[in-house]
Amino acid sequence: MAKTIKITQTRSLIGRLPKHKATMAGLGLRRIGHTVEREDTPAVRGMINLVSYMVKVEE
C-alpha cells in the first residue's frame, strides 16, 4: 500500500488567487477544518507546496 498523508485546510479561500482555489479543489478540500487523505506523490507534494500557507500536513 502506498504511503498516505493527511491534509487539513486551516485558512479560508476567500480572496485567494483562482489558481490557489483550483489547487485546493484538486486536493479535495472544501472548508476550514476539512481533512483528506492523499497518496504521497510528487504531484500532491507540489500542490501542497503551492498552498502551504492554507494547509496543515501530517505524515
UniProtKB/Swiss-Prot annotation:
The keyword Ribosomal protein applies. The keyword Transmembrane does not apply. GO terms for cellular component: cytosolic large ribosomal subunit. It comes from the Bacteria. Gene3D superfamilies: Ribosomal protein L30, ferredoxin-like fold domain. GO terms for molecular function: structural constituent of ribosome. Keywords: Ribonucleoprotein, Ribosomal protein. InterPro entries: Ribo_uL30_ferredoxin-like_sf, Ribosomal_uL30_bac-type, Ribosomal_uL30_CS, Ribosomal_uL30_ferredoxin-like. Part of the 50S ribosomal subunit. NCBIfam families: rpmD_bact (TIGR01308). HAMAP family: Ribosomal_uL30_B. This is Large ribosomal subunit protein uL30. The gene is rpmD.
